[in-house]
Amino acid sequence: MKKVMVVYDGTEASRLLYERMTAQVRQQGLEAQVVCHDIKRDSESGLSRGSGISEFRGRIDDLAAHVADVDLLLVHLAPVSHEIIEAAPRLRFIASERSSVPNIDVACAKEHGIAVSY
């Protein structure tokens, strides 16, 4: 069974993403999980510092602690850095609700054979 995680980052867009995707995921018989993120920007999560990402909300360490068994990751503003990708050995697909992905380390995802959609 595939596991889908929809990350809630405190925004209306992520709430709607959760509602729409959770309904679709459940119709397919998949397990869905919501992770609530701290929406505050702080010096650790708001700056790139070579992590391959910028402009995001939430703590990298918080999400990394919950992705080990996730196959599909759906985000809006939540960070998807190399730390998160490396903590998710089953991850095969990342989808973003945004029109660009400054919050996703696309190069790292490619290196790990993970598709990214936005």
Enumerate the predicted regions with their spans.
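N-terminal glycine-/charge-rich "phosphate-binding" loop or analogous flexible N-terminal tail
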Residues: 1-70
